[in-house]
Amino acid sequence: MVINMKILITGATSGIAYETALKLLEQNNFVYLCTHTEEEKYLLKEKLANKSNAKVYKLDVCNENDLKLLDILDYDVFWSHAGIGNGGAVLGISLDTIRKNYEVNVFKNIAVIKRAYENMRHKNIEGKIFVTSSLAAYLPLTYLGAYTSSKAALSSLCYTMNKELKLIGSNISLTLIELGAYHTGFNQVMIDNKERFLKPASTFYLYKDKVTKKQNNLFNLIEKKTLAAVSTKLSKQMSKKNPKFLIRTPLIQRLLVKLYIIFLR
């Protein structure tokens, strides 16, 4: 098999990253799929046992030993997809809960991006870096503020990094992926876990069930139920010599966010 690209993906256990990885594997690319835990690694290895062009690693972005993989593996495309969503009202959860969202979604994302950049720069290759953020970065979603604001920070940093890479004429590109609501299970976890992080003594705790019901109704209405279109779109962009900087999808949610910013913000 002639290998086209070597791609490393964090947070690739399931959902959009996993489905996109399958598309990339079909196109004769070599893909490193990275999981959060050892258990996830073994399960994913079993699922991909017949794929000779796939390799599975545990890469917890909060584990310094795991991060060394980014320095030693050979890849020319890097996709930073790992993230968390701890819910609860900003004034009703601990600073540690807010900090954890930022630690993973902002600081650890930047940490892995920097390592991937250095890996590619030292090899003097035309590398590509993709970063997953969220359309929710532009929305004040009740009891999800720690998550949405961390994604806003990540998106802002990506805009800046893109300008800085262009300033120095780098042969490494950066693409920001701002995803809308897809039915991967992530949104449901984020909606349901607010009870774990809200302080019972907080007034906001009393409204958690009401907020959860509204959010479940909202996501049931707007979530895209299939991942075929988004995985195809992302795999195509990763295969391009010059991928575009900004990918916002799906279209209808992208337009709704634009309308919100213009008329309601």
Task: Label the predicted regions.
Residues 13-14:
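Conserved glycine-rich cofactor-binding loop
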Residues 27-43:
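Conserved glycine-rich Rossmann-like NAD(P)H-binding loop of the short-chain dehydrogenase/reductase
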Residues 81-86:
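Conserved NAD(P)H cofactor-binding loop of Rossmann-fold oxidoreductase domains
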Residues 89-90, 97-99:
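Substrate-binding pocket helix/loop in short-chain dehydrogenase/reductase
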Residues 113, 150-153:
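Active-site helix of classical SDR
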Residues 134:
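Residue(s) in the substrate-gating loop at a strand-loop-helix junction
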Residues 167-244:
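SDR active-site lid
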